[in-house]
């Protein structure tokens, strides 16, 4: 890990630990989980939010006011809004995506859950997602939360990352394996 990334992840971990402990002490982990999901989605979808957090053009006060307005508009809990305001005042909003991921991991650990990253060729139906989660739960022995993305280049099938293991049942991977087998024969 490079030094700047290490520093960023260290900063994010400190904010994540603090907001997690505050929410846990107040019994507000469900609200914090909802806030982190909303912030993660907002970060992915909003170039303006990413610019606000990462651009050196904005002064501390501007960042602080803007993030407070964003928190109010999103209806975030007081603990989350105060944490974001503090991060804005310290010019630490650039670590927001790492902090969100860290908090989500802490909440999942607290709940005895693990997250499986699922990439599918087409969106999963609710019943397919439920069956996949049940199958992964049987394998992992813990509740599994699915984080799904769609990648049409897979043609069909799934790629599932669960902890340190990866299961690739995609047509794309099977075609690549056949191509390699044909190269060895011919």
From Swiss-Prot:
Entry's family note: Belongs to the ATPase delta chain family.
Q: Which InterPro entries match?
A: ATP_synth_OSCP/delta_N_sf, ATPase_OSCP/d_CS, ATPase_OSCP/dsu
Name one matching Pfam family. OSCP
Quaternary structure, per UniProt, is: F-type ATPases have 2 components, F(1) - the catalytic core - and F(0) - the membrane proton channel. F(1) has five subunits: alpha(3), beta(3), gamma(1), delta(1), epsilon(1). CF(0) has four main subunits: a(1), b(1), b'(1) and c(10-14). The alpha and beta chains form an alternating ring which encloses part of the gamma chain. F(1) is attached to F(0) by a central stalk formed by the gamma and epsilon chains, while a peripheral stalk is formed by the delta, b and b' chains.
Per its database record, what is this protein's job? F(1)F(0) ATP synthase produces ATP from ADP in the presence of a proton or sodium gradient. F-type ATPases consist of two structural domains, F(1) containing the extramembraneous catalytic core and F(0) containing the membrane proton channel, linked together by a central stalk and a peripheral stalk. During catalysis, ATP synthesis in the catalytic domain of F(1) is coupled via a rotary mechanism of the central stalk subunits to proton translocation.
> What's one GO-annotated cellular component?
plasma membrane
Q: Per the UniProt entry, what species is this protein from, by scientific name?
A: Cereibacter sphaeroides (strain ATCC 17023 / DSM 158 / JCM 6121 / CCUG 31486 / LMG 2827 / NBRC 12203 / NCIMB 8253 / ATH 2.4.1.)
Disulphide bridges in this chain?
Answer: none
Alphabetized PROSITE patterns for the sequence: ATPASE_DELTA
Provide the protein name.
ATP synthase subunit delta
What topology does it adopt in the membrane?
Peripheral membrane protein
- Where is this protein localized, as stated in its record? Cell inner membrane
Q: Which domain of life is it from?
A: Bacteria
Q: Tell me the keywords, alphabetical order.
A: ATP synthesis, Cell inner membrane, Cell membrane, CF(1), Hydrogen ion transport, Ion transport, Membrane, Transport
Q: Name one GO molecular function term.
A: proton-transporting ATP synthase activity, rotational mechanism
Primary residence = membrane
NCBIfam families the UniProt entry points to:
ATP_synt_delta, PRK05758.3-2
